[in-house]
Amino acid sequence: MADALIDSQVPAKSGGAGMLKKSFPGLSFLDNLSEMTMLRQIGLLVGLAASVAIGFAVVLWSQQPDYKPLYGSLNGVDANRVVEALTAADIPYKVEPNSGALLVKADDLGRARMKVASAGVAPTDNNVGFEILDKEQALGTSQFMEATNYRRGLEGELARTVSSLNNVKAARVHLAIPKSSVFVRDDRKPSASVLVELYPGRSLEPSQVMAIVNLVATSVPELDKSQVTVVDQKGNLLSDQQELSELTMAGKQFDFTRRMEGLLTQRVHNILQPVLGNGRYKAEVSADVDFSAVESTSEMYNPDQPALRSEQRNNEERQNSSGPQGVPGALSNQPPGPASAPQQATASAPADYVAPGQPLKDANGQTIIDPKTGKPELAPYPTDKRDQTTRNYELDRSISYTKQQQGRLRRLSVAVVLDDQMKVDAKTGEVSHQPWSADELARFTRLVQDSVGYDASRGDSVSVINAPFAPAQAEEIDSIPFYSQPWFWDIVKQVLGVLFILVLVFGVLRPVLSNITGGGKGKSLAGGGGRDGDLALGESGLEGSLADDRVSIGGPSSILLPSPTEGYDAQLNAIKNLVAQDPGRVAQVVKEWINADE
């Protein structure tokens, strides 16, 4: 027995309405929509509108181009000139509201940079230089304002110069220049402070800090280097003079040592590379350099070559007389007493002895008269003589002053390792590795010693050994994965957009519309007003998304018809109950079937 969907509230003959619904399928959707409550109608319309809006947004997102920053920030950039340059070149752009970055399309990034650069737009700092002096000054400008403008201009120019150094992103310079005074007690020296903002992950070398200090100190009159302070953006003091000098000296010594080692290593390469080939040996040189400053003074004497430097002679002769002696005066100028001749000569004195100061007599006993003075000659008094000679001799002396130069090579160590020599068999062409002989290693050792200036007295060491090298493994350059390519993400966006639209259509819109239109079909098929309305269950009861649902037949006492999957017995019992409750309508349905068959 065929199954049927019957609506007991529809008149038995209503073929006109059934034909109208069949001719216009959308009327069933509107009919079912009108039978819903107002809240469900609003919810359905809002859901449909939201689905369409989301689908439209996904399509726009998939078609949206990739934007990249032209400037990470508009700080220090004339935004008006940048926008004018991009607009004139017809390059679309947008500004990121959170970071303030200026974004352009990835395809237009290179062209945008060229256009902006050709327009003369470049990032600049906010420092004001000497261009502040180009402005017209008011008639009543005071000397203080003029001095302040000059100081601001000098600070700006110094900040720009410091900012041009590597690793320095921006800089600010503050100058404290006191007013000059004619009084010495009021004289004050100027000072300066420099704040440097470094790039992330960068730092300044001690030599660069000293360069900044010297640059600022020589740009301001009477500014001493000790009065310049350099600080970074983290508050670290960079201009500690003592530490800077020590670090600078240590850095110079380290660089000098590395340069010396590099020069000696290059000499070894120049000797071994033509003989062994590239990559067949490894050489390293270690130099012990003495940077101590030594000053010495030596004085040497040669006693074999004396020289008379000075001579002093002193001859003294003294005679005893009875003349005036003592302190000059009345007491010392008294005349001498009368001379008294001895009454009897001593036995020891000779016969012709004349006492000192007595007149001399000749052999005849006559007094000898001095012809010049006409006075008698007197016997001389005793005389004391002394001769003293002082001679100073100068020895041969040599004084030498020696100052050893810093950077003296104290010791040198050279290490060379040789790979096995390669032998090619002339017959088979096979390559074999053989170690070097002792004589060949000794020959290479002598070559290396001569190339680096080997000095045994200095304690230099040169080691040349033979060891097989590990086989070199070629490093494969990893290709860029496809998922990192820009085109891949463009395709992914397109595919995701299409998938989202398909899910939205077939997963949301279609089930909703099927539920609505399916309910209308059930009611139109259950209506008894026409041939098309009274269809058998076998023709349409299994169609649509409601084929497995239980269908309600409206009437005074509603009867639920079983679904086709519940079996033939359940359907038969439901039809029997329907015939028992409303036999007239069942008879009308049978008549419609008969008329349809004829």
From Swiss-Prot:
A GO molecular-function descriptor: cytoskeletal motor activity
Residue ranges of the region described as Disordered: 296-392
Subcellular localization, as worded in the UniProt entry: Cell inner membrane; Bacterial flagellum basal body
The keyword Cell membrane is annotated on this UniProt entry: yes
Bias (Low complexity): 340-351
GO BP terms: bacterial-type flagellum-dependent cell motility
Record field: transmembrane: 42-62, 488-508
Keywords assigned: Bacterial flagellum, Cell inner membrane, Cell membrane, Membrane, Transmembrane, Transmembrane helix
Membrane-related topology note: Multi-pass membrane protein
Gene3D superfamilies reported for this sequence: 3.30.300.30
GO cellular component term, pick one: bacterial-type flagellum basal body, MS ring
Cysteine disulfide links: none
Quaternary structure and interacting proteins, as annotated: The basal body constitutes a major portion of the flagellar organelle and consists of four rings (L,P,S, and M) mounted on a central rod. The M ring is integral to the inner membrane of the cell and may be connected to the flagellar rod via the S ring. The S (supramembrane ring) lies just distal to the M ring. The L and P rings lie in the outer membrane and the periplasmic space, respectively.
PANTHER family: FLAGELLAR M-RING PROTEIN
Family (UniProt): Belongs to the FliF family.
Protein's recorded name: Flagellar M-ring protein
Annotated source species: Pseudomonas aeruginosa (strain ATCC 15692 / DSM 22644 / CIP 104116 / JCM 14847 / LMG 12228 / 1C / PRS 101 / PAO1)
Taxonomy of the source species: Bacteria, Pseudomonadati, Pseudomonadota, Gammaproteobacteria, Pseudomonadales
